[in-house]
Structures are given as structure tokens and as C-alpha cells.
Amino acid sequence: MKKMFLFLLAFVAIVAEAQTKGNFEVLDLGSFKLHVYNTNDALGDASYIIEGKTGLVTLEQPLFKDNVSEFDAYVVSLNKPVQKIITDYHVGGTGNHDVVMIEGMPDFVKGTIYGGMMKNFAETFGNAIASMPTGKIEEIPMGSTQNWNGVKFSFQKGASTDFPAASIIIGNKVYYTHWTPVKSHVSHLQISSLAAIDAEITEAERALKSGCEYFIGGHGGAVKKDMVEFKIDYLKTMKRIIAANKTADSFIAAMKKAYPNLPGEAGLADLAKTLYK
């Protein structure tokens, strides 16, 4: 896992650039609404608002100041109180507001991997990102189910090779994990080993079995189950290709042949370097 986040530190140094503000979309799920905020920031982050009848729960608030301002203004426009602020995989610009985190994540955030990543963000992006949060942290037990604004939030262990954060089932209709499944080649930041492939397959199969209607992530927006099915098939195909190819170059060629014109081809070289060390 440490190798993957060292790659991330190098990655952010390359993608630092002027930002385009984000956009919102709203999904009406009957008993609650899911507001999806695609930040369009340099990290491809997404943030969410779960709107119940009497209040709001925010999830993975933005990190960049322009996005924080835009997100906060949108929250105010909903004219409902924010009951909980969930920080799961991504520490955001929550200021001095109290937040909810899965047990163990507050210590992990202070550690060398996550703490080093946030320090690098500060050095790379400077004043463009918000200061580290200073609010009180409420730790939620892994495996617990919370009921906020009449919506159930079930916290379960995420992919074993990722941060020690949680996948969250929201209202039995939305499944949140670190990376939204998309029809694209995976990043070397997500898959850094054969063990990571297996862990992501296990997590995706668990998501599919949840019966949820939408699948969301800290990177990417909201998708339906066909994207989860694609991810599972893609990763299993990747495992077979790795077993059949002994070099990075032959792996890249085989992946391109298996998925012609699939977005993300440019990232296959970095992925191959990671997998064929």
C-alpha cells in the first residue's frame, strides 16, 4: 500500500494546474436525494450531499478552496441543517466543524503515508487548498449502522489494500467506496500489485451483491451496476493477461488488444511499471 501512495505523491506534482469549478447533479431516490458534486479539480475528486426530509449529511467535502466555497454555498442553498459531516477516504476543507470518521482513520491520517501525502499536497498546490481540519472527530465503529435524518449509513471495511477506511451503504440504494467504477483502464494509483487486483475484485463483488442502485466514489461520480460488472470483468481479464505475459510491453499490448480504444490507454505504461517491478 505504501508504494501506491508514493506514486500518488509523484502524480500530484504533475497534475497541479488551474482548476475549473465543479458541477452538481441530483438523484432523487425517494426517501432521500443524493447530490453529486463533481469538483473537476486536479485530483478528480467528488463530494456528496445526502438530503433527508429534515437535514443533510455531507460526504467527502472538497479540498480545494474554490470548490469548498462552491460546495458550501450550495449546501446553504438547500436551506436544511447539516447533521453530520463524514470524512472517509478524503480529508477535505471542513474547517473547524465536527466530523465523523471510521475508527482508526484519525490516527492513520496523522501517519507517514496519509500525512506525507497531505504535506505534499500543501507543497504542490500551496494556497489553493484548504487548511487541515481542526474540528472534533467522532469515530464510528467499523461494521456499524448509523441513522441520520431517517437515512441508514452502514459502514463496512473497504478494499484491504487501500486506506483503512470504509465502504458505506447509504439508504440501501447507494454504495460508496474510494474509486467509482468506470469504463476505463485503471490507474496505477489504484492497482499497485496482484494483491490489489484481488482486493478490488472482492470489493466490487461485494458492492454488486449489495443490491444498491447507484455506485459512487471519492474519485468519479455516480454510476449504475453495469460499471461495477465491467470493473469485475476487466480486473479478472487483467489477472489472466498478467499470468500469460512476462514483460511490461507484452502486457500493455495484450490489454490494448483486449480493450481496444478504451479510455486511459496512456496510463497503461505506468500501470505496467508498477505491476512488473
Q: Whereabouts are the PLM-identified features?
A:
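Boundary at the C-terminal end of the N-terminal hydrophobic targeting segment
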Residues: A16-T20
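Conserved beta-strand hairpin/beta-sheet module of binuclear metal-dependent hydrolase folds
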Residues: K21-S77, A166-W179
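Active-site metal-binding motif and surrounding structural segment of the metallo-beta-lactamase
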Residues: T54-G55, K65-F108
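Sec-dependent N-terminal signal peptides
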Residues: M4-A13
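Metallo-beta-lactamase
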Residues: K21-F24, D28-L29, L63-F64, V109-D233, T237
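Accessory terminal helices/loops
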Residues: T112, G116-M118, K209-Y214, G221-K277
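Short catalytic-loop micro-motif centered on adjacent basic/acidic residues
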Residues: V57-E60, K84-I86, S154-F155
